[in-house]
Design a protein with these regions (language model features):
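Nudix hydrolase/Nudix homology domain
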Residues: 30-33, 95-149
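Active-site-adjacent beta-strand/loop module that shapes the phosphate/pyrophosphate-binding cleft
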Residues: 8, 71-99, 112, 134-141
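Short, charged/polar surface micro-motifs in flexible loops or helix N-caps
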Residues: 19-20, 30-33, 41, 79, ...
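N-terminal strand-loop-strand
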Residues: 1-35
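Short histidine/acidic/glycine/proline-rich micro-motifs that form metal-
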Residues: 40-41, 73, 118
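The catalytic Nudix box helix
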Residues: 35-69
Length: 149
């Protein structure tokens, strides 16, 4: 087991089953689209932090970890921060972006439920491997797996 990085954030790849297939929840902050995530507080477990962050950023409280509690991480951001992501399902389509009491406004300006291809186009190159990992864990076809590579 590798040591915990000095700056760890935790988040959840939140998915929802729609009529046309699985949708991924993306949140927009400034010009960046990402999955819900935030810093792990001292003494807090990463999974607990991930669940807390989803609730704080979206008010979702019905997460089901159908694919277990496995996780993947991004490479280090500046200042050594690493983001750890889990996968969870929600049945809630309507998302609320509540006001953050510290900021006095919502942390995110927009949310979208998008399919795998849409998510692939919106997320940053750093987050694309997380999206691929989640899709593979869910046994969804991805361009790489569909081509046999």
């Amino acid at each position: 087991m590798s040591p915990r990085p000095s700056r760890l954030s935790a988040g959840v790849v939140v998915v929802r089953q729609a009529e046309e297939g699985w949708k991924f929840l993306l949140l927009r902050a400034f010009n960046h689209w990402d999955f819900p995530k935030g810093m792990v507080e001292p003494g807090e477990e990463a999974l607990a932090a991930a669940i807390r962050e989803v609730r704080e950023e979206t008010l979702l409280d019905d997460l089901e970890f159908d694919w277990g509690r496995d996780w993947t991480s991004t490479g280090p951001y500046s200042h050594g921060k690493i983001a750890r992501y889990y996968i969870a399902r929600t049945s809630t389509e309507s998302i609320t972006l509540p006001v953050n009491p510290v900021l006095g406004r919502p942390e995110h300006s927009e949310f979208r439920w998008v399919d795998y291809d849409g998510a692939q186009q919106l997320v940053s190159p750093r987050v694309r491997p997380v999206l691929r990992w989640a899709a593979q864990a869910m046994n969804l076809p991805t361009p790489r797996s569909a081509s046999g590579g």
